[in-house]
From Swiss-Prot:
The protein's name: Cysteine--tRNA ligase
GO CC terms: cytosol
EC id: 6.1.1.16
SMART domains: DALR_2
Top-level taxon of the source organism: Bacteria
Catalytic reactions of this protein: tRNA(Cys) + L-cysteine + ATP = L-cysteinyl-tRNA(Cys) + AMP + diphosphate
Cofactor: how and how many bound: Binds 1 zinc ion per subunit.
Enzyme class, first EC level, given as a word: ligase
Positions occupied by motif 'HIGH' region: 35-45
Cofactor(s) of this protein: Zn(2+)
Organism this protein belongs to: Mycobacterium ulcerans (strain Agy99)
SUPFAM superfamilies recorded: Anticodon-binding domain of a subclass of class I aminoacyl-tRNA synthetases, Nucleotidylyl transferase
Pfam families according to UniProt: DALR_2 (PF09190), tRNA-synt_1e (PF01406)
Length: 468
């Protein structure tokens, strides 16, 4: 099958499913809003990575060349505040958690992006974008900051459906703003914060500006698809559109948004304290099982986390895995086959993964019946098809990469038991004000390549790679 098979995607801007037609035949350009690296990645973060990794894999299977950009926001109020509270340099804090996100994506076999730009590496492009906006009458300097004039852009609110009169940027009152509906492009320097020189004085970029500048740098003035979580529709993506198009760029042609992961009906977020960190989850289930779970619901739906739902996904994945192992042990090697028309139709219909999974489990049932009846050819054909389908979803159980990840996950679980014991000893030493012993334990862990960060939720550890 070819790229002209009729892929349709739900475009948030249109509020409907649309035929996908790329700007350039055979090529697709995608920008995914990546992490603000302020803390450990949780399953809400990584669901976005998995959802749009499936999109990328399907496009590649269809024969497209895919340019996939995922940024890193490494300068932000939350990063600065948390680093200051921990008495650590902001750049060290950001780098620590950037590595944690990379490790989480790698563990779940999310394909590496074509490029992964950091915000701090693209300040020059951000300043150039601001200059264009000021020249066109869409931005102004005030009080040391630079703001986007929302009323200067008549189409503001079309993505989110917000009426201009009802806009609240959530930035608080700023003395330099002409209108409180305007949003910040550039923040004037504050004592103790990182800053860069500009024509308007030293400062640092606003969050919305970062993505517009990086998307343009790597994908050009117009590109195919912009992805992100549904919580980014407003104000982040609305503001990206406004500043990019006001500067004369076509920007994204399709907008795709994935649903939240919730617990008890509430969005999973650090501020609510209801997060499930990826390292914690990988002590409970294997990486492939977690990926299967996060990708199993339709990407636009809310994924309500529960232990029962997680176990159901694990059981479903194990059922597929056991079938493939049965075929391999009885018949022989199982090569990757072709995808089926029903599977292709499901993914072409706005990435309907639940229907695609139903096809996989239907084939598995047929394959098990064939194997029990001694029809090895039919069983092998079923197994080969399943490998192809599960591979497009990124969780083929017979892929050798998963076997190595399973071993790594088991090793990390064993290390965690040992590290937690050391952290308990360190906490006891701190309670007894035995600072020398507490420092000795921390240094011992550091020499083993384990970074310990004290947070409001207790100490967290990461493999830092700096062991002697």
């Amino acid at each position: 099958m070819t790229e002209r098979a009729g892929l349709r995607l739900h475009d948030t801007a249109a509020g409907a499913v649309r035929d996908f037609v790329p700007l350039r035949e055979g090529h697709v350009s995608i920008y995914l809003c990546g992490a603000t690296v302020q803390g450990l990645p949780h399953i809400g973060h990584v669901r976005s990575g998995v959802a749009f990794d499936i999109l990328r894999r399907w496009l590649m299977a269809r024969g497209f060349d895919v340019a996939f950009i995922r940024n890193v926001t490494d300068i932000d109020d939350k990063i600065l505040n948390k680093a200051a509270a921990a008495e650590r340099p902001w750049w060290e804090w950001a780098a620590t958690y950037e590595r944690a996100f990379t490790a989480a994506y790698d563990a779940l076999d999310v394909l590496p992006p074509s490029a992964e730009p950091r915000a701090t590496g693209h300040v020059t492009q951000m300043v150039e974008l601001i200059e264009r906006l000021i020249e066109r009458g869409h931005a102004y300097a005030g009080g040391g900051d630079v703001y986007f004039d929302v009323l200067s852009y008549p189409d503001y609110g079309q993505l989110s459906g917000h009426k201009v009169d009802d806009v609240h940027q959530g930035e608080g009152v700023a003395t330099g703003k002409r209108d409180q509906r305007d949003f910040t492009l550039w923040k004037g320097a504050k004592p103790g914060e990182p800053s860069w020189p500009t024509p308007w004085g030293r400062g640092r970029p606003g969050w919305h500006l970062e993505c517009s500048a990086m998307a343009r740098t790597y994908l050009g003035a117009q590109f195919d698809i912009h992805c992100g979580g549904m919580d980014l529709i407003f104000p982040h993506h609305e503001n990206e559109i406004a500043q990019s198009r006001a500067a004369g760029d076509g920007f994204a042609r399709y907008w795709l948004h994935n649903g939240w992961v919730t617990m008890g009906g509430e969005k999973m977020s650090k501020s609510l304290g209801n997060v499930l960190a990826i390292p914690t989850m990988l002590q409970r289930v294997r990486p492939a099982e977690l990926r299967y779970y996060l990708g199993s619901a339709h990407y636009r739906s809310i994924l309500e986390f529960s232990d029962i739902a997680l176990q159901d996904a694990v059981n479903a994945y194990v059922g597929v895995e056991e079938f493939l192992h049965r075929v391999r042990s009885r018949v022989g090697a199982v090569v990757v086959g072709d995808w089926t028309p029903r599977f292709a139709a499901a993914l072409d219909d706005d990435l309907s993964v639940p229907i695609a999974l139903a096809e996989i489990h239907h084939i598995r049932a047929e394959g098990n019946r064939a194997l029990d009846a001694g029809d090895h050819d039919a069983a092998l054909q079923s197994a080969s098809s399943i490998r192809a389908l599960m591979g497009i979803l990124g969780c083929d159980p017979l892929d050798e990469r998963w076997e190595s990840r399973d071993e790594t996950s088991a090793a990390l679980a064993a290390v965690d038991v040992l590290v937690q014991a050391e952290l308990e000893n360190r906490q006891k030493a701190r309670e007894e004000r035995n600072w020398a012993l507490a420092d000795e334990i921390r240094n011992r862990l550091k020499n083993a390549g384990i970074e310990v960060t004290d947070t409001a939720d207790g100490p967290q550890w990461l493999l830092g790679g700096d062991g002697k």
